[in-house]
Amino acid sequence: MTLDPDFSKNDGLLPVIVQSADDDKVLMLAYMNELAWHRTLETGKAHYWSRSRRKLWQKGEESGNVQTIREILLDCDLDTILLKVVQTGGAACHDGYESCFYRRYADGKLEVVGKRVFDPKEVYKK
């Protein structure tokens, strides 16, 4: 039985669900390729593959909001990864929120329900 995710599926990109190790709150959804997987295992820090920039990146490399791995789970088909992490800085979202899922959809409207931890204009000065 293989112990690694099956990167032969989905053009080598697998979805990664990221949860807080403290309270199981869903923080974000990202993608990993085999390189990101191995870098994550080597460093103990979450690394992902950016589909838009087409490059490897470490979560928090610009913001300092690094994700330290506490536990890794794989689904039954070995094609989805669940990371339980300790989120440094309190924000997983590049918009400055604790979770990327900071908006609730109801009655055809979006309502901000998450807590903003930082101003992205201050953190990502480009």
UniProtKB/Swiss-Prot annotation:
Family: Belongs to the PRA-CH family.
Domain of life: Bacteria
This protein's pathway: Amino-acid biosynthesis; L-histidine biosynthesis; L-histidine from 5-phospho-alpha-D-ribose 1-diphosphate: step 3/9
InterPro entries: PRA-CH, PRib_AMP_CycHydrolase_dom, PRib_AMP_CycHydrolase_sf
Binding residues annotated for Zn(2+), in chain numbering: C76, C93, C100
Complex and partners: Homodimer.
A Pfam family hit: PRA-CH
Localization (cell): Cytoplasm
Xref: HAMAP family: HisI
Function: Catalyzes the hydrolysis of the adenine ring of phosphoribosyl-AMP.
Cofactor: Mg(2+); Zn(2+)
GO terms under cellular component: cytoplasm
Catalyzed chemical reaction(s): 1-(5-phospho-beta-D-ribosyl)-5'-AMP + H2O = 1-(5-phospho-beta-D-ribosyl)-5-[(5-phospho-beta-D-ribosylamino)methylideneamino]imidazole-4-carboxamide
GO-annotated biological processes: L-histidine biosynthetic process
EC category name: hydrolase
UniProt-listed Enzyme Commission number(s): 3.5.4.19
Protein name in UniProt: Phosphoribosyl-AMP cyclohydrolase
Cofactor detail note: Binds 1 Mg(2+) ion per subunit.
Keyword Membrane appears in the UniProt entry: no
Assigned keywords, A-Z: Amino-acid biosynthesis, Cytoplasm, Histidine biosynthesis, Hydrolase, Magnesium, Metal-binding, Zinc
Gene Ontology terms, MF aspect: magnesium ion binding; phosphoribosyl-AMP cyclohydrolase activity; zinc ion binding
Binding site for Mg(2+): D75, D77, D79
